[in-house]
Amino acid sequence: MFQKLIVITFAIALASANIFDFLNNFNAGGRQQQNQGVRTPQEYESVVLNSQCDKYLCPDTGLCVEAPKFCPCPYPSSQIRCFLPDGRFVCISKPAGEGISEKYNDPKTNWKIDAKDDNIRDCGWVNRAWRGLV
């Protein structure tokens, strides 16, 4: 009787593991199909090496632009591009909050805004942090 109980428990555990493994693979497969981007370093290398770009290929987005300073942020609806004093740039999350986030919606001007408040992380804050003032 005890052996049958052990066998039944083992069979249920094995069946449950197979079902969860199937569901996990099923869900992962759906995500992979939605993600059209590069998945491995080899694929990334292939995309870069086979690019037809004769100017500058942005490493984060794969877009062909005139110069590195024209590369967009990977997530432009939620990020702003802040220029550093040395000419490079970093992408940071747009500041959020009531009455604040609307100021940062225009990509042509959002990098110029400085709230002059160290509690609001915008491009002004990035420049102050770069100079060691934060």
Swiss-Prot record:
InterPro entries: LCL2
Signal sequence segment: 1-17
Keyword Signal appears in the UniProt entry: yes
Domain of life the protein comes from: Eukaryota
UniProt keyword list: Signal
GO annotation (BP), single: ERAD pathway
Keyword Signal assigned: yes
Similarity-based family: Belongs to the LCL2 family.
Function: Probable component of the endoplasmic reticulum-associated degradation (ERAD) pathway.
Protein name: Long chronological lifespan protein 2
High-level lineage: Eukaryota, Fungi, Dikarya, Ascomycota, Saccharomycotina
GN (gene name): LCL2
